[in-house]
Amino acid sequence: MDKKYIPSALVLYLNYFIHGIGCSILSQQVVKEMLASQWGLKDVMAVTSIAAALGLGRLISLPFAGPLSDKLGRRLSVIIGCASYVIFLVGIAFSPNTTIAYIAAVLGGIANSFLDTATYPAVTEIIYKYTGIATMGIKFFISVAQLLMPFFLGIVA
């Protein structure tokens, strides 16, 4: 393992910390209530359909995200994933209705696909002696973000 690439690995792992937040934010009751009010919905559970759009975006983009990552490079795939996550998070927070939120959530799924196709190979190449630990690090950062999210919301709300 070349130590000069450790900061790169940490940045890649940090992307998955953000991914953990993105995945769990729509499942938090406080957020559901706020978004239902923002979108003029009477039923808080209607927000769950927006969360399902994350999976749809992932399914749509997986067939081409991998080949694009191989062809254009992992760095560009990570940038596309990060940019899509920014659009997703800002779009969900400021969407005036469920249509815009659904589109933003599809972009969140696309972000996840692009990050997966670039980050997994990158961290296993950086930490090549311990590839199992390298991929477990991704799950670790997702889990830590999901663990901390309710506490962050409790402080803010």
PLM regions: where:
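Cytoplasmic helix-loop-helix junction between adjacent transmembrane helices
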Residues: 106-140
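C-terminal ends and interior cores of transmembrane alpha-helices
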Residues: 83-96
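Membrane-interface helix termini in secondary transporters
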Residues: 66-67, 155
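Helix-breaking motifs and short loop linkers at transmembrane-helix boundaries and internal kinks
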Residues: 73, 94-96, 128
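Helix-loop boundary and gating motifs at the non-cytosolic
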Residues: 5-38, 46
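Residue-level signature of mid-helix packing/kink "hotspots" within the transmembrane helices
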Residues: 54-63, 146-147
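Short hydrophobic/alpha-helical segments at membrane-entry points of transmembrane helices
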Residues: 12, 99-105
